[in-house]
Curated annotation (Swiss-Prot):
It comes from Halalkalibacterium halodurans (strain ATCC BAA-125 / DSM 18197 / FERM 7344 / JCM 9153 / C-125) (Bacillus halodurans). The lineage of its organism: Bacteria, Bacillati, Bacillota, Bacilli, Bacillales. Pfam families: GrpB. This is UPF0157 protein BH1888. Residues 1-21 are annotated as: Disordered. Residues 1-12 have a biased composition (Polar residues).
Amino acid sequence: MPPMKDSSNSTPRTDEELQEVTVGELKPHNASITLLEYDPRWPKLFDREAKRIRSVLGNKALQVEHVGSTSVPGLCAKPIIDILLVVTDSADETTYVPDLEKVGYTLRIREPDWFEHRVFKGPDTDINLHVFSKGTSEIDRMLRFRDWLRANNSDRDNYARVKRKLAQHEWRQVQHYADAKSSIVQEIMKRANAT
C-alpha cells in the first residue's frame, strides 16, 4: 500500500482501518522488514509482468510503469515489484478485474476514498499492482518520486538509510512501515517538486 493518505499525520492506521480496505483477511506481519540490495533482475521481472498485463488488457492498459524502490537502480528494497497500472476508471472493476484474475492476479486492496486505488497481488512473483484512474494526481507523484531518486544519488542514499533504520523495527503491519516513511518521502518530494 502507499503512504498514508494524510502524510502529515504520523499515526499509523489501525487494524480496523486497514481491514476496511483489505479484500479478504488482514494478516498481521509482526516482524521486521526484509530489504535486499538492488537486484538487476527486478526490471526484467517488471518487463515480464508488464507484457502479461498488456496482453490481457490490451488498450485498457493506458499506462504500465515500474515504480517503487525496485525501479531505482542502487536502492535497497523489499523484494516486491511495484507496478503502476493506469486505466480509464479504476472504480469500474468490471472492465479490468476479470481479465487480471484470468492471468492469476488477486485483488487485495480497494480504497474508494483514496483515488479509487486498487492493489492486486501477482500470480507467481511478489508483485504489488497498483491501479489508478487516468488523470489521478498520485500517478504523477509516484513517477516523479521514482525519477527523482533515479537522478539524485544523495536523496536515494538518504532514503535508503531511513528505510534500513525503519526496517529493523518489528511492525505489526507492513503498511505501518510504509506509513513511517511518509516524512522522508515528503521531504524528498518537496525537492522534486521544486524543479
